[in-house]
Amino acid sequence: MTNAIIEKAKERFAHTHESLAREFGAIRAGRANASLLDRITVEYYGAPTPLNQLASITVPEARVLLISPFDKGSIADIERAINESDLGINPANDGSVIRLVIPALTEETRKELAKEVKKVGENAKIAIRNIRRDAMDEAKKQEKEKEITEDQLKTLEKDIQKATDDAVNKIDSMIAEKEKELLTV
């Protein structure tokens, strides 16, 4: 039963890491990356549809994204969705494909994005600490209900703390990696 608490916490830690990686992918680093467009939804025949389901997205050059719609009739809708998004990138429509040229980041923009990375990373650490608290509460509840002994509780708390420390260290390394990517010219 005690291992179930740790396994559940580790599973939730992994979900937090995946979520953080997705959020970091959406922060542009001056290089083209298809994940920049993950959050864009297109109004297609009256239904909001993710862009990656309406078109293939390729990276032909370091700072260019090429969007090839499966249905050429949707190209105007895709262009409108990109213009309305908060990407700050103007699409170039040539009738059959849309080109997005990712502008080089200024030093000021890089620093702002690095701050955003730290903020997002800090939120992930808060989520990790909340998961730890939930696991600790569950362990104390089991000890209170005499399902485990006090010694088992202490061991379990140490194991939960070690798993938490590992999860936080992974977040720190993810933050450092993304900051390095952003600040490298």
From Swiss-Prot:
CDD domains: RRF (cd00520). GO terms for biological process: translational termination. The keyword Cell division does not apply. It comes from the Bacteria. One of its GO terms (molecular function) is ribosomal large subunit binding. GO terms for cellular component: cytoplasm. InterPro entries: Ribosome_recyc_fac, Ribosome_recyc_fac_dom, RRF_sf. Responsible for the release of ribosomes from messenger RNA at the termination of protein biosynthesis. May increase the efficiency of translation by recycling ribosomes from one round of translation to another. This is Ribosome-recycling factor. It comes from Streptococcus thermophilus (strain ATCC BAA-491 / LMD-9).
